[in-house]
Amino acid sequence: MEAFKEKVERLFQKHEELITRKNVAVEDGNGIFTRYKYPVVTAAHTPVFWRYDLDEKSNPYLMERIGMNATMNSGAIKWNGKYLMVVRVEGADRKSFFAVAESPNGIDNFRFWDYPITMPEDAIPATNVYDMRLTAHEDGWIYGIFCAERHDDNAPAGDLSSATATAAIARTKDLKNWERLPDLKTKSQQRNVVLHPEFV
């Protein structure tokens, strides 16, 4: 039977091979965009130590403890010479969190930062957050606008899946420390919002 340490090393080796795999264009493109063979970020790109308890005593069979279902709908920005995405990472429980993945070229070699984003709550806590869009604003802040989903209090008793959606707003200077601002107030549920990078 393969030793625990060797299994861990193999997990990290496979992960590194995935992250450093060169992406290749699959068609000439139309001059506007180029399609590539591999998705730039998948659930398998999330760090091994997010998904696995690497302690042999508490996880002797090296079972994945925190399942990652998918990565999707990222907001992207070129910042300090790197391509960064705030990725929606969906867990096996279908709840999402945000994490930053960084690449030198925006095509491959996307590597997640060590820790997911810790997003402060609004006055009314959200049951789920997703689909952040980033804007580097002329005021010096990077703004993230995303969907904050909350339980719908008008749903019938026992209905735990009905939800309301609002455009939540947060800002940061470093993509690590975030300040939560009040949600955008609208008459109807609105989460598809654009913030211009300069004052109009």
Regions of interest found by a model, annotated:
Residues 1-73, 77-127, 135-200:
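Beta-rich carbohydrate-recognition and catalytic domains
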